[in-house]
Amino acid sequence: MECGSHSGHRPIPIWLSSCLVAMCLGLPLGAAVPQEAPAYYYVGCYTARTDLLHESVYAKTPQTCIEICEHQGHHYAVLASEKCFCANVLEPQEQQDEQLCNTRCLANKAQYCGGVGVHSYYSTILTKQPGPHHLRISNKTENSLTLSWNAYEARKLLLAGGAEAVLPNQLLDNFLIKAQVLKTYSSLPAFPQPEFMVQSTETQFELTDLHPATLYNISVRAMCKDAQVGQSECGQASIEATTEVGLPSPVPAQPKILSRTDRTVTIELSPIRNDNGPLSKLLVIVEYVDNALSQPFDAQLLGSWQQAQQDGVPYYIAAELDYDRPEDNRTRRFVVGDGKRYGRFTNKPLDQPDAHVHISLGLVSTLEGVTKTMYSRGTHDQHVTSLDDFSYATFEKGQSSVVALAVTCVIFGSCLLLSLIAYFYLRYKTCRGRRLTGGNTHEMTLQTPIIERENNGYLVEDDPLPHSPENFKQQLQQLVEGYERIPRNALRLNVNDVIGDGRFGEIITGKVSTNDFARDCTLHVLCLDDLNGTTQAQLLRELRQLSQLKRQEHLLDFYGVSASPDWFYLIFEQQRMSLKRKLVESRLMAPSPRLTSLSEQLVLQWIYELASAMNYLSSCQVVHRQLCSHSVFVTSDFKLKLSVFGPLPYMNIARQQPDHNRWLAPEVLRHQHHHSTRSDVWSLACVAWECCALGGTPYANAVASNQQLLEAIRAAVRPAQPAYVYGDLYQLLLNCWQLEPSERSSCEDVAFGVRQLMTSPRHALSFDRVAGGLDTLPPYLPQLEAVATMG
């Protein structure tokens, strides 16, 4: 068979290609095609486009048309007989058979320039490299970007002015795709994106697990096989693209109500953070609350005050504040009902003076024409006043004010003098009575060991009892010398705000002033004279373990101690928001597309922070013994803080004491004193499950009896796997719930496993609500988590 030359730009048949290869190998060196000769890439034959007819120019050859379109910055040169068009878009579904482009070009009859109802497309990129051509973004979402590029075929690479194909020296093997973050709004730690390898025949690839509203630089490298050097890079292309803006996260702190009149409410707005895009606007929402029935407002019906009156709904948008400048996002005060216009809404004065009002917020994030809004509903906590909300009486200038101040000073001075006299008299009588009856007034009784569960942070089982009150105070003094001493006048106590009660005494709130800076704090109030021998030993044990701990970012800070002759204060950092409450309040009702306002990344970050804190306690040989979601707190910047001293705080304003039996390991439920780091791992997994279950109650289908709970655990009952929690994460929890303590994972293992899952959070769990499906959130039953009351 004779090897004839091929005319035109159509693909060469297989047998002709083989003949051409043999001829090229037999040519002398001087007859080889020069490498610097210009070449162009023939894309294919496509359906004629009518929108290009009014922009045509005259061109006799593809090379002339390519040069014109390249000069104008277009991606493609389109030929139809002697007419030349330029285009940037190519529709793959409009590709036709190569044989339909049969009209020969005027200046070179060996080439074809379109046909009847079809056009010939050429790439304007003059190259012989098989890199990806016309790299573009074909689709994007919050967490993904879809890349597309033109398919490369070596048989379509033609010499300028000729019709023969340029045979490549390299064979395209695959593509390597990598994305790098250039700009993001997120303050969360960024994890490096993996490199993906796709086959050379692919022309599209979807990058997933990306962060919303983040600018990425995406590079696609072509890897070729060479007979001499093996695999090497033979071309590349890159593009910058931004993912869609996501639903604002995290949930902002609710506004604090400073004061109220009949027509206005003054609130304080804290700085707001958004990890899923820019913070464009802030909506201030007024909601009239019915205490008998409190339901979330419907975002579809949310509008202006006039629209609320027409629809008959008890909520409306009072203001739309601009937050697109850095100076806007700060602590600021705002008056609801001042009658002014903010953005698209008028801030109407309140028309129900006696009604209970909640102020909610709406976070609006807009990027590249896409807008997402997240609503944070106000609660009763925004009405709680703090120690900063005191108002002081003032007097008018004049003689009346001088007289009033003088009378006040005399009265209070007399009361102070009488108090001092009574104090020294009672102290004299008490000391004299002790000397008469002896130093040790404890009744001598035979006591047997009693095992009971302690509601404090650590349980003491074998500590020796102090021999006398003097010995106890001596040991206490030695421990206290290692702590920072805070003078009593640096403390401001809120004695009516009792947030917990345990064996050692009550826990109240207050403020501590150090270095001219006042901070909120919680104070464990101890009356040392009221402690018996066993409680004294337990207190010494806890203080010894507290002295072993240094400052750790995920433990509540210990500020120091303050002592007086009658009272002893242990001062800790104050955090009001418990993890349990934060998880439950984050739940969203239908028709919201999400089950929660929290992101998957944040929930995994919380589990990692908690595991890191427990690993630190384990390294210090400290056993927590009462780890649960009620002993973990969430800060204003969405970091976790673990309480390591004292009783659990009350669950609600009714002062219900939490019962953490549902978080205990089976050996602790059975013996009540077999606490260890391995039993803490069991509790850690229960709290991690709560994070995934958005505050669900562990073993919600079991009663509160310890014996029945123990029997259920022995029967292989574990907290159920929610439908949106995937196998890898749930298996990590199951490894912590082994009956044999030695077979459980360590806190370090849990932290390492969660860290790996954080590289792809949505492969571990997904809070997206399934369309048409039922809510699968585990139930939250607070009555099962509280200590049962008698009667």
Swiss-Prot record:
The gene is Wsck. The lineage of its organism: Eukaryota, Metazoa, Ecdysozoa, Arthropoda, Hexapoda. It is a single-pass type I membrane protein. Residues 423-791 are cytoplasmic. The keyword Signal applies. The protein kinase domain is predicted to be catalytically inactive. Probably lacks tyrosine-protein kinase activity. Glycans are attached at N139, N217, N329. One of its GO terms (molecular function) is ATP binding. The chain crosses the membrane at residues 402-422. This is Putative inactive tyrosine-protein kinase Wsck. Residues 131-246 form the Fibronectin type-III domain. Gene3D superfamilies: Immunoglobulins (2.60.40.10), Phosphorylase Kinase, domain 1 (3.30.200.20), Transferase(Phosphotransferase) domain 1 (1.10.510.10). Pfam families: Fn3_PTPRU (PF23144), PK_Tyr_Ser-Thr (PF07714), WSC (PF01822). Residues 1-26 form the signal peptide. Residues 27-401 are extracellular. Belongs to the protein kinase superfamily. Tyr protein kinase family. GO terms for biological process: anatomical structure morphogenesis; neurogenesis. ATP binds at I499, G500, D501, G502, R503, F504, G505, E506, I507. It is found in: Membrane. Keywords: ATP-binding, Glycoprotein, Membrane, Nucleotide-binding, Receptor, Signal, Transmembrane, Transmembrane helix. It comes from Drosophila melanogaster (Fruit fly).
